[in-house]
Amino acid sequence: MSCQIEITGLVKRFGDNTVLDGIDLCLEPGERVAIIGPSGTGKSTLLRCLNWLDTPDQGTIRMGDVTVDAARATKAQILGLRRRTGFVFQNYALFANKTARGNITEGLTTVRGWPADKARARADDILAQIGLADRGDSYPAAMSGGQQQRVGIGRAMALDADLMLFDEPTSALDPEWVGEVLDLIRRIADGRQTMLIVTHEMQFAREIADRVVFMEGGRIVEQGPPAQIFGNPRDDRTQAFLRRVG
């Protein structure tokens, strides 16, 4: 196994509550990994630690040639991680005072340091790819939830990141917009983008993932191909969870 992304011994605490309790995970280049499990079990926190939105207490994260130890992380190393990740938030997290185009160019100019004209050209290309070529000048308030989340995904796509992180990308959407967002994620996955997806959409996880990880209590309980996890889970906790979600 050749790890493009390697997570070792990751621990995150909020006060006395240990949310991540020694996570070890490896992602191969182009691998699509879905994380499932009960609410409050640390799935979203894991993604946020990988982008240093939440600061882990222990453990190491390696992406390509950048390795960050939580105990001695430097600003340069953290920036190196962020430059290698694209994050799609469940609540869109768009800038209300920026257009669709402006939301996409923001990361290119601030994280990548691109000049404005180059960032604009990239944003227009991305808007075309996500089916919003005619909405570049629209503000979030004038767009549907599905359109806003597509802009959020486009913002992450624009960075050409080593790893795309999806934190329950459909949970805030009205049912009518879920399909279009899932279709866009499928298209990205078809390009063999390395992806880590937290989702409550079990059928989507079954379809898109090369590997499914079941988490509970801040730990990885079981992982394997979708056919195994959904068809023949080995751990009683995985079996119980899948029975509950139907």
What are these regions (language model features)?
Residues 216-217, 223, 227-246:
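C-terminal boundary and immediately downstream tail of ABC-type ATPase nucleotide-binding domains
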Residues 4-5, 11-226:
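ABC family nucleotide-binding domain
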